[in-house]
A protein has these predicted regions:
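Low-complexity, glycine/proline-biased repetitive segments and flexible coils/loops
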Residues: 1-187
Length: 187
């Protein structure tokens, strides 16, 4: 059975002898993400990232493809990379690593653990499970996202609930960071 990677903002990597998922399905410019990597047989391709296609896996026993790199953003001050692709699973070989930006690592078929989950608050993709017959490990969970609002210093920002934060950028601007659903009040 061919395993097809799902399309999305960034595409999923191809499973054994399958096809990779397309990225940027919304048709945005600049693009919001790239396609997953392909495979010819065996190991899976890596998931696409915000700035790069996931790596393809070669013919068995090649390792799983690495996840595509995410996008750096310095809205908080120091640059942080977000939305890396998950690594492809390995078949009797090494699994792919997650892409920079929180992508989870893939798993090989030496056991039944699922693929690694994406890093929280980065939007990184989950890594692929392996192919340990008869058990087929599941893929890892995608990392939760984050919303950051930046305003000039003259504004006052209040956020709820308390899990979200209101801080000051090193340059003086105000920042509201949301890691859970909440409300922003600007005055």
């Amino acid at each position: 059975t061919r395993k097809v990677g799902a399309a999305g903002g960034s595409g999923g990597g191809a499973g054994e002898a399958g096809t990779a998922g397309a990225g940027n399905v919304g048709g945005f410019s600049p693009v919001e993400g790239f396609a997953g990597g392909g495979t010819s047989d065996g190991s899976g391709g890596g998931g696409g990232g915000a700035t790069a296609v996931g790596a393809s896996a070669g013919a068995w026993p090649s390792p799983g493809g690495n996840g595509g790199a995410g996008a750096p953003n310095d809205i908080l001050g120091p640059a942080t990379t977000y939305a890396g692709g998950g690594g492809g699973g390995g078949q009797n070989s090494t699994a792919g690593t997650g892409g920079a930006g929180g992508g989870g690592a893939g798993n090989n078929n030496g056991g039944s653990p699922p693929g690694g989950s994406g890093t929280v608050n980065t939007g990184g993709g989950g890594g692929s499970g392996g192919s340990a017959t008869p058990c087929v490990p599941s893929g890892g969970l995608g990392g939760s996202g984050i919303v950051i609002v930046r305003t000039p210093s003259s504004y006052t920002l209040a956020v709820t609930p308390g899990t979200n934060t209101s801080t000051t950028h090193p340059g003086g601007d105000k920042l509201a960071t949301f890691t859970v659903t909440g409300t922003l009040t600007v005055s």
